[in-house]
Regions:
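Conserved catalytic-core motifs of GNAT/GCN5-like acyltransferases
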Residues: 101, 105, 117, 122-141
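A conserved beta-turn-beta hairpin within the catalytic core of GNAT-like acetyltransferases
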Residues: 60-68, 78, 100, 126
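A short helix-loop-beta-strand connector motif used in the catalytic cores of GNAT acetyltransferases and
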Residues: 35-45, 102
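Conserved acetyl-CoA pyrophosphate-binding loop and the N-cap/start of the following alpha-helix
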Residues: 77, 81-89
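Conserved GNAT acetyl-CoA-binding A-motif
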Residues: 94-108
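Short amphipathic alpha-helix that is part of the acyltransferase structural core
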Residues: 1-30, 142
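Conserved beta-hairpin
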Residues: 41-56
Length: 142
């Protein structure tokens, strides 16, 4: 893994679909994958000889609201510091892009909160914000 590079570039729809499958996330079609990739504010990848090993994406309005939507490393490579490399790039992007008072949000999988805490994130139940909420299944559209 000596040739692993961090590259600020979009991923392909096929890569997005493949990594969702690796994570056990619900399947999305190619059109949906293309749209979500195109709408990202920022994407950073880990690649070795052109092969995707992981990626992170940020979505939002690019000024005041930023949501870290994915920080995904191939399961075989977890624990090797690759997620940290991705997040370091995300944090640098946010420093360049976010205005004073911006809201930067991440919704980690249960048990992964400490990963984000090392980058300064706090759990929402700190008294200022509620615990955070989501719409299960997102069945607003087929």
């Amino acid at each position: 893994m000596a040739n692993v590079v961090v590259v600020e570039e979009a991923i392909t729809a096929a890569e997005f679909i493949e990594f969702r499958k690796l994570m056990g996330s619900p399947h999305v079609d190619s059109e949906t994958a293309r749209k979500t990739i195109a709408n990202a504010l920022y994407t950073v990848c880990l690649r070795e000889d052109g092969h995707l090993l992981g990626f992170a994406r940020v979505v939002g309005d690019g000024v005041l609201y930023f949501y870290i939507s994915d920080v995904i490393v191939h399961p075989a490579l977890r624990g090797g510091g690759y997620g940290i490399r991705l997040m370091n790039s995300v944090v640098e992007y946010l420093k360049r892009s976010a205005r004073a008072g911006a809201m930067v949000v991440v919704v980690p999988l249960a048990g992964r909160e400490s990963f984000y805490e090392r980058f300064g994130f706090r759990q929402c139940s700190d008294g200022r914000f509620g615990a955070g909420m989501y719409l299960p299944g997102c069945t607003l559209r087929p």
